[in-house]
């Protein structure tokens, strides 16, 4: 399997707690039918941030 490269999120919505955060679509290898899993990761000034309290 080829794990997709990180890329900007498509239609990420917004990050309520950190409006200026950047969304990246991050994939990593996983034990499932696709061989990988992906998630939206929000970062601001190099730090991962949570978008919801």
Swiss-Prot record:
Keywords: Disulfide bond, Metal-binding, Metalloenzyme inhibitor, Metalloprotease inhibitor, Protease inhibitor, Zinc
Recorded GO MF terms: metal ion binding; metalloendopeptidase inhibitor activity
GO biological process: negative regulation of endopeptidase activity
Residues bound to Zn(2+): 53
InterPro entries with a match to the protein in the record: MCP_Inhibitor_Domain_sf
Keyword Disulfide bond: yes
Domain of life of the organism encoding this protein: Eukaryota
Disulfide bonds: 9-23, 15-51, 27-38
Gene3D superfamilies associated with the record: 2.10.25.90
Quaternary state and interactors: Monomer. Interacts (via C-terminus) with human CPA4.
Function as written in the Swiss-Prot or TrEMBL entry: Metallocarboxypeptidase inhibitor. Has an inhibitory effect on bovine CPA1 and CPB2, human CPA1, CPA2, CPA4, CPB1 and CPB2, and porcine CPB1. Does not inhibit D.melanogaster svr (carboxypeptidase D). Shows no activity against serine proteases subtilisin or bovine trypsin, cysteine protease papain, and aspartyl protease porcine pepsin.
Protein name according to UniProt: Metallocarboxypeptidase inhibitor
Upper taxonomic lineage: Eukaryota, Metazoa, Spiralia, Lophotrochozoa, Mollusca
